[in-house]
A protein has these predicted regions:
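Bacterial N-terminal signal peptides that target proteins for export
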Residues: 1-7
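A charged, solvent-exposed segment within the mature domains of Sec-exported extracytoplasmic proteins
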Residues: 118-181
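Generic structural signal for well-ordered, non-transmembrane alpha-helical segments
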Residues: 36-46, 50, 68-79, 100-114, ...
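Short, solvent-exposed, charged loop/turn and helix-capping segments
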Residues: 79-103, 115-127
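Amphipathic alpha-helical coiled-coil segments with heptad-repeat character
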Residues: 24-28, 57, 64, 92, ...
Length: 181
């Protein structure tokens, strides 16, 4: 009886160690590209946002031009990221849900910024421009769960493998440094 029990325990140990998680494997090129695509979707908007904040609020024409640049940068970046992330697929079985939620967020964000472009273009460049542009953006938003972006970062940072990948990623480094890289 002891021999059979010992054999069963050993067999279970061998089988469970053979089925290691994704964490046990080195980062693949595709997984690194996925991390880069995730962070890369946010960098153009961050840079355009910094440029917008640097504008003199009294120069409404410059503020409008910078705001439109922000809308365009985000639209393009989210559309490109959606294509790249779809092409790459989920980085691992453990992150399939994270990938699906991120895909939805990126898609909704791209549509939101695209929908905001025309209403923002129609706005007069005056003292109320910024407030009116923010309202137009909020009114056209199609993002059902904005917290998904933070949840994606949290899920990746919980994983030593993906946390390290974020640390090595150039686009993620740009995000962390606020575009100062």
């Amino acid at each position: 009886m002891r021999t059979r029990l010992l054999a069963a325990v050993l067999a279970t140990a061998v089988l469970t160690s053979a089925c290691g998680s994704d964490e046990d494997k080195p980062l693949t090129d595709a997984q690194g590209q996925w991390v880069d695509a995730f962070c890369g979707a946010l960098v153009p908007g961050m840079k355009a946002g910094l440029e917008l904040k640097a504008q003199d609020p009294a120069d409404a024409k410059a503020v409008k031009a910078a705001y439109l640049k922000l809308v365009t940068a985000n639209t393009t970046a989210f559309v490109d990221a959606e294509k790249k992330l779809k092409e790459l697929g989920a980085p691992s079985d453990e992150l399939k849900d994270v990938h699906e939620r991120l895909m939805k967020y990126v898609s909704e964000s791209a549509r939101s910024y695209e929908a905001a472009r025309a209403p923002v273009e129609k706005l007069e460049p005056n003292a109320q421009f910024w407030e009116n542009a923010e309202k137009a953006l909020a009114d056209t938003s199609q993002v059902s769960r904005p917290e998904e972006l933070r949840a994606t970062f949290d899920a990746l940072e919980k994983s030593p493998k993906y946390s390290a990948a974020i640390g090595k990623s150039v686009p993620c480094g740009e995000l962390k440094s606020g575009g100062q890289r």
